[in-house]
C-alpha cells in the first residue's frame, strides 16, 4: 500500500538530473564561475531520455546536469578561490576609488591564485589518458600562440602557449616520432606517434593576425588555462623518458640568469639546434633487432620499416631556407628526418654560400643558382615525409607546376574517386591497388563511345535480315531480373528499426558514387584541355 501512494517526481530522471539554475543556487556561484568550474573539472550537460519527467512535468527548455556531478563539484576547494577573487575585486575597486596606490600594490601582491595541478592528476590518472586528450590541447595552444595579446588574452598566457608548444615540437624532433603531415586551408596538420598513441593536431599558417573581435574568448581562455597546466606535466614526463633536461637546454648545460635571457630562449625555441641530454641516462640503440612473432608480424614489420625510413629520411642532407618559406614547419619535418637546417640569422650559423648545403628550399624565382645544390619548393619536404622516401626533385623545381598534395589521413576505399596521381603514389609505396583500380566507376559518356566503335555501318538501301534468338542476352536479362527481385525480397525482410539506417546507407553510397563520377569526368575534361 505504501508504494501505491508514492509521490511523483521522487525517483528516476527527476532525481538523477538537476537544472543549471538549481546547480547555481546549490553552489552559490555566478554563471561565469560555474562555466569555468565545469570546464576545469570536465563536467558537461546531459540530455535526459525523459526530459518532461526530469523537468517535473514542464516542457520548458532547460540545461540539465547529473545530480551526482553537481554534488561532486560542491566539494571542490577551487570554489573558495573563486569567492576570494570576488572579494579581491571588491577591495580593489574600493581602493582605486580612494586612489591609495600603496595599498593597491600590496593588494596585487596578495592576489588569490589557484593551482590546477591536483585537478590535472585527478582527471588523468594515467599518462596514457593524458596523451589521448592531447589533440585538442595542442591545437588550441598552437592557435593561441599565434594570437596577439589583448585584455582577455594575457601576455603571460600567450607566452606559455608558445613555450609549451615549442617544447613538445622539440620532443617530437628528438624522438623522431612525426609520422604524417598535410597542408590545408585551415593550417598544417601533423600526426606523431608517442608511446603508442597517435596524436594529431593542426598549426595555423604563419601570418600576421589583427585583434580578433568577433570571437568570445572567455570560454576558450578557461580551456587554455587547463591545457597549459596539463601540457606542463606531459612535457616534463616526455623529456624525462628520453633523457632531456627540462626546461630544455642547448648543447652545454647552463644555469642561472642565462636561461632567462631572450637570446637564449630564441635559440631554444627556434628548433634549429639539438637539445642537451643528461649524462646519467643510458643511450639506447634504435637499430636493435625486434622479435616479430604473432599474427600481426607482417604489419608490425612494415611499421618498424616505415619508422626507420622516417628517421633516416634526410640523413646527410643540409637544407637552407629562403626567407619566404615557413621556417618552423620545414625545420620541424627536416630535423625529424635527421637533416640539418638553417636560414639567414639561424642560431646554427649556416651561411647561404656554404659548400655543405645540399638542398635549397625556395618559393619564388631566383636570379643566381648554385651548381652544387638542389633547388626545390617547400611541398617537396612534406610529400617526402608522407611517402617515406626522398622523391625526385624534377617535379618540385622552382617555377614548375607542383603535383597534387594528397592527405595521408584519408583511407582509400573501393568505389571512391581516386585520382591517377594518387594511384601512382600508392603503387610506388608498394601497396596493392588492383582492387581500387577495378572498382573505379565508369562514366556515362564512355559507354556511347564504345558502342559507336563496335557499331557496324548501316548498308545502303532497305535490307531485312532473318530474326535470330540471342540466348546469352536473354539468360543475362532473366538473371538480372531474378537478382533484383531477390534484393527487393531481402529489403522487405528488414525490420522497421533498421529500415531507416539501410536507406540512409543506400543513399550515401549512391551520392558517393555520383560524386566519384563527376570528379572523374572533371579530371578527364581538365586533362583533355591541358593536352589541347
UniProtKB/Swiss-Prot annotation:
Q: Where is the BRCT domain?
A: 309-398
Secretion signal, residue range per the UniProt entry: none
PROSITE patterns assigned: BRCT
> Keyword annotations for this protein?
Nucleus, Ribosome biogenesis, rRNA processing
GO MF annotation list: ribonucleoprotein complex binding; RNA binding
Q: Does the keyword Nucleus apply?
A: yes
Q: Name one GO cellular component term.
A: nucleoplasm
- Where is this protein primarily located? nucleus
> Where is the protein situated, by its record's location annotation?
Nucleus, Nucleolus; Nucleus, Nucleoplasm
Family that this chain belongs to = Belongs to the pescadillo family.
Name of this protein: Pescadillo homolog
Q: Which gene encodes it?
A: lpd-7
